[in-house]
Amino acid sequence: MTQFIEGKWVAGLGHEVTSINPANQEVIWNSKTATPEQVSQAVDAARNAQFDWFMLGFEGRLAIVEAYRDQLEANKAEMAEVIAQETGKPQWETATEAGAMIGKIGLSVAAYHKRTGTSESETPAGRAVLRHKPHGVVAVFGPYNFPGHLPNGHIVPALLAGNTVVFKPSELTPKVAELMLKLWEKAGLPAGVINLVQGEVETGKALAAHPQIDGLFFTGSSRTGHILHQQYAGDPGKILALEMGGNNPLIIKDVADTKAAVHDIIQSAYISAGQRCTCARRLYVEKGATGDALLEQLVAAIKQIKVGPWNAQPQPFMGSMISETAAKGMVEAQRNLLNLGANSLVELTHIEAGTGLVSPGLIDVTGVIELPDEEYFGPLLQVVRYSDFDEAIKLANTTRYGLSAGILADSREDYDYFLARIRAGIVNWNKQITGASGAAPFGGVGASGNHRASAFYAADYCAYPVASVEADAVSLPATLSPGLSL
């Protein structure tokens, strides 16, 4: 019983699907997918529950969301363990993700009041009141890299605003989603307010195309996001929020503390085995002896990175990629770059057949004429040597993406120069570019998103503004308009 529809756990009626621990091939979860008919049942359940959920009022909805927060707190160790088993991420990282899910509640409440609350003011025309109302039924598509935190970041603000949800998680991390719904159930969520449909592409297509959803919130690949964007282009009545990753640049310029710079490069490129949408994919290093010395330190540090299963002790920095297929894809990406003329500085290797375990790679692509503008979603960092700062910024902007970017530089003037010219939604200075604040918006431009930033700004796409001019009684104006007599 792995689908949650109208407050009941039911069996999927589609084909069998299995979730496997990518570090050891252990079966974590096995069930059947939701059919298109079951997707329709889930949407109908959400539709039937939506008005009552909205009319419960913010305080009533908040009480249930806070009860869910308490369930997360009580079960955070289990949540972290399930995330680790399904994704292959080390336990120190998944404990952080479980904690972020708890923290998201307070941030979402603050965002609701600041971004979409109610306000009023007196005007000559009457009392002007601004309110916000929910869209209705929204679909949430979750990714595999943060299977708890990222969908949680859509679901919580959507519910606070008064929407109901149909949640389709990644088929690679279904057990995390199942645990989330069990905690919502324990929190006393009314039937139909969240519905879970587990499945693969056909389940997602059925949900995305359903005529009775009012919006879709998506985190995932640029390819899928662009398909959804085209699909929704002819339906302006539906809200579409896309977060789609990037080919993110990091520039190094005149840094005295090279050890700290190496640390921030590693944290930017290799955390989560390179499977964060904000991970650095391109590293720009000055030509000459200073850049050579930095790269020498970086190569030595990369070779010391510990890689291992999610439960290894002592804990590794990098766990497994999400699957053996993903690991092989990174080996192939490296091969393609080498065939284009790149030079390997640290080879990315598939450590163990049958697993997603790979070692981190560093590859010099300076001078490669037709460098692919691709998001290689794994621990492979491309190095480009540059002659002057303007060249580095120009190269950094040579991408259709625009999610995150950063510069490590001791000069504030260099940062200001970079900030004014770089095109990205997240721009960091002397910090890893995988670091983002939940109290700030999170999103990119270009192929990285559609101007629907998430995190603190998720409240914006979960409700629409309703502007009213009000008076307590009907009254005649002091002076009638010309040509009128009453």
UniProtKB/Swiss-Prot annotation:
One GO BP: arginine catabolic process to succinate
Residues involved in NAD(+) binding: 220-225
Keyword annotations: Arginine metabolism, NAD, Oxidoreductase
InterPro entries referenced in this protein's UniProt entry, alphabetically: Ald_DH/histidinol_DH (IPR016161), Ald_DH_C (IPR016163), Ald_DH_CS_CYS (IPR016160), Ald_DH_CS_GLU (IPR029510), Ald_DH_N (IPR016162), Aldehyde_DH_dom (IPR015590), SuccinylGlu_semiald_DH_AstD (IPR017649)
Pathway: Amino-acid degradation; L-arginine degradation via AST pathway; L-glutamate and succinate from L-arginine: step 4/5
Disulfide bond sites: none
Pfam families found in the cross-reference section: Aldedh (PF00171)
UniProt xrefs under CDD domains: ALDH_SGSD_AstD
Catalytic activity: N-succinyl-L-glutamate 5-semialdehyde + NAD(+) + H2O = N-succinyl-L-glutamate + NADH + 2 H(+)
EC number assigned by the record: 1.2.1.71
Gene3D superfamilies on file: Aldehyde Dehydrogenase, Chain A, domain 1, Aldehyde Dehydrogenase, Chain A, domain 2
List of catalytic residues: 243, 277
GO molecular function: succinylglutamate-semialdehyde dehydrogenase activity
First-level EC class: oxidoreductase
Domain of life: Bacteria
HAMAP family (alphabetical): Aldedh_AstD
Similarity annotation: Belongs to the aldehyde dehydrogenase family. AstD subfamily.
Record function comment: Catalyzes the NAD-dependent reduction of succinylglutamate semialdehyde into succinylglutamate.
Name this polypeptide is given: N-succinylglutamate 5-semialdehyde dehydrogenase
Upper classification of the organism: Bacteria, Pseudomonadati, Pseudomonadota, Gammaproteobacteria, Alteromonadales
Gene that encodes it: astD
